[in-house]
Design a protein with these regions (language model features):
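Intrinsically disordered, low-complexity segments enriched in polar/charged small residues
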Residues: 7-8, 30, 271
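N-terminal, motif-rich segments that launch catalysis or mediate targeting to/interaction with membranes
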Residues: 18-247, 277-432
């Protein structure tokens, strides 16, 4: 049995932990929240640097962060306590911004530029664009070739939806990379998260996966074989950033209220993606056990095929959905079911008010239950010969042919994405 559990553990440990869920969170957030009354009625907010926020509220932030840490230790299973030497001390000298980020246990090298994304209909004609390297910390920036970042200046006023939507993409800009003890850099050895639980620690993108994935609903046998699956931390991030958002609103720093709220929203949206809520969609405990038995006996073909299948399907469906959305926005196709899904409120009556158990018990569970059907539908689409590899006129790759059944599944998942986004934002703004 021990050998079998080891083989099963190795299979799950090798499962691909991908970088992004739903591609550009800002675009989806902009569409999902465009008609939210609480945002439509809100006044423009004044841009403020993090340094100014810390200078004004440093003493009160010490109490907030200590209370958050105590809550996490008491309420989050398998929570790795923050080392005491990382506590936020408002009177300390030195780099206050770095000290604050380390108290949150995020990557202290993140840029935190003052910016908004160039979103559909957002008019800021006299502003310059920022190069991607001033916004993201990654060495390879090709994934963000189509993103455009508009520079803002402290003191200017900007609509809160633009701030919130732009911030919803930020945690993918390096907030959670290199935080484990076996990652490059110095902070992983100090943060207390231990070694990276899954993913390939050699790649900078991979190291953020345990913060953007929530495997909360696997079977007891899976957890026994792979206890490292419990070491995921999106609940911690949501609790941190929601608390900071409410604090910022209460203390009159509305810009940071919306920005922190966008950061919290990111992790909720991540877990609406089924591949972020189930370790190996398309595999039951029984099929995983059989694959593990064969691997333990030396036949690794099924293991390698399962890993490759999940990686390919996740990657291709993300490209498909992102390309579909961008094409619709370029064409102005407002009657598309995908665009309608971002505005659709039909599922919201099924959701309870947002609380700190919501991410695990509502968002992740819903995505977990959809995972196998989603994976099967992607497989059927790919079996038709997609994605397209033929060239059209102009020597450009043809876009993948649409699949009505896959489209219907994606539309329903986007309803979930949008409904949970509105639920979180509405709850926070009504109860700051």
């Amino acid at each position: 049995m021990k050998r079998l559990l080891l083989a099963l553990s190795c299979l799950i440990a090798c499962a691909p932990a991908t970088l992004l869920a739903w591609s550009n969170h800002s675009l989806g957030t902009w569409l999902a929240l465009a008609d939210l009354e609480e945002l439509r009625q809100a006044e423009p907010v004044q841009v403020e640097s993090l340094e100014a926020f810390l200078a004004a509220e440093g003493v009160a932030l010490e109490q907030l962060l200590d209370e958050q840490e105590a809550f996490a230790r008491e309420n989050f299973p398998d929570y790795p306590a923050r080392p005491d030497d990382l506590s936020w001390l408002p009177g300390s000298t030195g780099d206050r911004r770095r000290a604050f980020l380390m108290a949150l246990r995020v990557n202290p090298e993140i840029r935190l530029a003052s910016f908004v994304q160039a979103l559909p209909g957002l008019q800021l004609p006299d502003h310059r664009f920022l190069p991607a390297e001033q916004v993201l910390v990654f060495r390879k920036l090709n994934l963000w070739n189509e993103w455009r970042f508009i520079a803002l200046s402290p003191g200017e006023r900007i609509g809160p939806l633009a701030v919130l939507a732009s911030a919803a993409d930020e945690p993918d800009y390096g907030h959670d990379i290199n935080l484990f003890s076996d990652n490059p850099g110095e902070v992983g050895a100090r943060y207390g998260f231990g070694t990276q639980p899954f993913g390939d620690a050699r790649f900078e993108y991979s190291s953020q996966a345990p913060f953007h994935i929530g495997y909360y609903h696997e079977s007891a046998l899976i957890y026994r074989a792979a206890p490292f699956l419990a070491r995921t931390y999106p609940e911690m991030r949501v609790q941190q950033y929601l608390g900071l958002a409410r604090f910022a609103f209460e203390s009159g720093h509305d810009y940071w209220g919306y920005r922190f709220l966008g950061w919290a929203l990111h992790y909720v949206q991540d877990l609406t993606q089924p591949y972020h809520s189930k370790a190996l969609p398309g595999e039951t405990t029984a099929t995983l056990m059989w694959t593990a038995i064969k691997a333990a006996l030396g036949d690794t073909a099924d293991k390698e095929a399962a890993i490759e299948r999940v990686a390919t399907r996740h990657t291709e469906v993300e490209k498909y959905q992102a390309d579909w959305l961008r094409r619709l926005l370029r064409e102005g196709s407002n009657d598309s079911p995908l665009l309608a899904a971002y505005r659709d409120r039909s599922v919201e009556g099924d959701y309870p008010p947002f609380d700190l158990g919501y991410l695990r018990n509502v968002v992740s569970l819903e995505a977990y239950e959809a995972a196998d059907g989603f994976d099967e539908r992607i497989g059927a689409w790919l079996a038709k010969g997609q994605p397209g590899a033929d060239f059209s006129q102009g020597n450009q790759l043809k876009p993948p042919a649409s699949d009505p059944e896959l489209d219907a599944v994606l539309v329903q998942l986007i309803r979930h994405f949008s409904g949970h986004s509105r639920n979180l934002v509405r709850t926070t703004l009504r109860n700051p």
